[in-house]
Structure formats: C-alpha cells, structure tokens
Amino acid sequence: PLQRAMRWLDLDIAPVKAGDIAGVDIRPAQGPSYRLDANADGGFSLAPPYDKRPLVAALAPAVAAEPLTRLSPVDVARAMDVAVGAPVAEHITRTKLGVFIVARSWRKDDRGWITISAATTDAATPDAVSQANAINAKAAPWAFALTELDWSGFSTPLAAIAD
C-alpha cells in the first residue's frame, strides 16, 4: 500500500500561493506562539503583542508564513503510524478564502514529518468548503516526510524572526 502512497508525493496536496494567505498562527517547538498577518504589499508582519519588535530581516516573516507554498515531501507514510502523542509544533495557515490549513509537525525515526488537515468556519463560502474538502481528501490519511530545512520551516521560533 505504501508504494501506492508514493504517488501522493507528486500531487499538490495543499495548493496555496503566497497571495492566498491572509495570516498564519505558529506554535513553534521552542518559544512563544505568535501570529503573522498579510500586508497589502504582499508581505507579512508580526501581529500584537510582538508587532513592535525589530525584525532580524525584512523577509523573515514571509519565510515563516509560507512553508506550505513550498511543500515538497520526500516520503509518505500513514498518518496513524507517525502522528502519535502530541505534535512538536503547529502551523495554521488562514487563507483569504476562509480555509484554515493545519500542519502539525511530528518527529519519528529521526525524521521530520507533517500531517495536514483543513477546516472552515460555519459561515464559509461553498468555494472554501470545497477547497477544505479537497485538501482533506488528499492529505488526511497521510503523514509527509520533509527535509530538515523544510520541516523546520513549519516551526520557526519567534526569535528567528524578531529580536
């Protein structure tokens, strides 16, 4: 069955572009949780209470906000075999359409994995519900292994973005 699962590596599991993102909530493995909000110019800014902190680099918030846009799994396994206990971190992407895409980070056999699920609010449009259902249909049963660099992008600590 896992050979058939490998075909998922070639699919666009959660098709999100940077311009689709309204904001991101990040609960990293280390440090406090924080939020990033999209700017009118296409970038991202730290939300209160961290919005007054100086950034380590102008693009730092965008790098932390956009790992889902660069999703490139290197392996796949059944989610039930990887997602055991509490996740290491959580990265919630809020799209402008109203879809919440939740990427939970896991560590198994010295590899970084994520599981992906999507949800909407009760007031969601039919398009948002359709997009969330499509993501869940592709991603829900699976855990996706990532390179260390890609995996760490789903758990960027606040200290890596702002002083």
Language-model features: where?
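A short-motif feature that recognizes glycine-rich, charge-decorated loops
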Residues: P1-D163
